[in-house]
Curated annotation (Swiss-Prot):
Protein name per UniProt: Tyrosine--tRNA ligase
PANTHER family, per database record: TYROSINE--TRNA LIGASE, CYTOPLASMIC, TYROSINE-TRNA LIGASE
Top-level enzyme category: ligase
Pfam families reported for this sequence: tRNA-synt_1b (PF00579)
Protein origin, superkingdom: Viruses
Family, per entry: Belongs to the class-I aminoacyl-tRNA synthetase family.
Subunit and partners: Homodimer.
Catalytic activity: tRNA(Tyr) + L-tyrosine + ATP = L-tyrosyl-tRNA(Tyr) + AMP + diphosphate + H(+)
Motif range ('KMSKS' region): 230-234
Coiled-coil regions listed: none
Length: 346
């Protein structure tokens, strides 16, 4: 079936590149766009705790962007992966409840359900015997040292003492690329922290003569605490979560690291990667902005207290969508259960 989208190829290419910090490779992305066919992209997540604002909004905005550009999106709910990675102490029932919570957050934020499929890893793997065969073939292709270098995808270090199940994890994630759809995934749309396993999938495809996936890796926002720290669920004060109250949002933003420099500045990152993309137009410190270049130019002269107030107000406007969504009687218990889960340290 041919893509019926009327936007020209150059515009579609620009739109797809706008969501990525890194593209592997541009030539193959151009070929895909020029083909005019409907393509398939995927993103996946471990249901491993509270969902922070970057994971929620970037997933929704990138998914909708891909669909607008003529693609279809698979959101892969990696429940078995979370169990293997010892999230929620391996309690699969809690993990699955968290997965349902994530899906509801995406819905509240306006994900395009017409072009999105949610696939649960446990159900998919159990019903597709070829998945295990593919995973074992990738394991045969790889070395232990190569797989351990991919441990960043699990939030682990290469030097960590890993369980045997965690060694399988990168091979399984690479297998997703070739098994989720019969013809293979066209675009891996994951965070830049997942690039090593994407490269493993690309190298494997090259070696086995398979369709080579395109990797469109998005930026990972830094912690509100400042440079050298990635936004993390393990640092509640370093991130805004989609179940935070208005007061919690305001307090976190007011305490956030923010200098006159835009480099390594979490407030500027929130504006650039979340708020401007979401709203299109921002009123910051009494001035209207429609592009990041103008904000960057004026940033050093902005009153940071006033700026933080504006940023917190915009964030609360977005999270209000989620707050209202979970007021539905059938969802209030789900939210209560999620809030009660405490992620143990591993």
């Amino acid at each position: 079936m041919e893509n019926t989208d009327h936007t020209n190829n150059e515009h579609r290419l620009t739109q797809l590149l706008s969501i990525a910090e890194e593209c592997e490779t541009l030539d193959r992305l151009k070929q895909l766009v020029d083909s005019g066919r409907i393509f398939t992209a995927y993103n996946g997540f471990e249901p491993s705790g509270r969902i922070h604002i970057a994971q929620a909004l970037i997933t929704v905005m990138n998914t909708n962007n891909i669909i607008e550009c003529g693609g279809q999106m698979i959101i892969y709910i990696a429940d078995w992966f979370a169990k293997m990675n010892l999230k929620m102490n391996g309690d699969i029932n809690k993990i699955r409840e968290l997965g349902r919570y994530f899906i509801e957050v995406f819905k509240a934020c306006g994900i395009n359900l017409d072009g999105t499929r949610f696939i649960w890893a446990s159900e998919f793997i159990a019903s597709n015997p070829s998945y295990i065969e593919r995973m074992l073939d990738i394991a045969e292709f790889s070395t232990i040292s190569r797989v351990k270098r991919c441990c960043q995808i699990m939030g682990r270090n290469e030097s960590d003492c890993l369980k045997a199940s965690q060694i399988f994890y990168p091979c399984m994630q690479a297998a997703d690329v070739f098994e989720l759809v019969p013809e293979g995934i066209d675009i891996c749309q994951l965070g830049i922290d997942q690039r090593k396993v994407n490269m493993l999938a690309i190298e494997y495809a090259n070696d086995r003569g398979l369709k080579i996936p395109i990797s469109l890796s998005h930026h990972m926002l830094m912690s509100l605490s400042g440079p050298k720290k990635k936004m993390s669920k393990s640092d509640p004060q370093g991130a805004i979560f989609m179940d935070d109250t208005e007061q919690e949002v305001s307090e976190k933003i007011s305490r956030a690291y923010c200098t006159d420099e835009t480099f390594d500045n979490p407030i500027f990152e929130y504006i650039k990667y979340l708020l401007l993309r979401w709203f299109g137009t921002l009123n910051l410190c009494g001035k209207i902005y429609t592009d990041i270049e103008s904000i960057q130019e004026d940033f050093s002269s902005m009153n940071k207290r006033e700026l933080k107030t504006d940023v917190a107000n915009y964030i609360n406007t977005i999270i209000d969508l989620v707050r209202e969504h979970f007021k539905k009687p059938e969802l209030s218990e789900l939210l209560s259960n999620v809030k009660s889960y405490q992620q143990p340290s591993k």
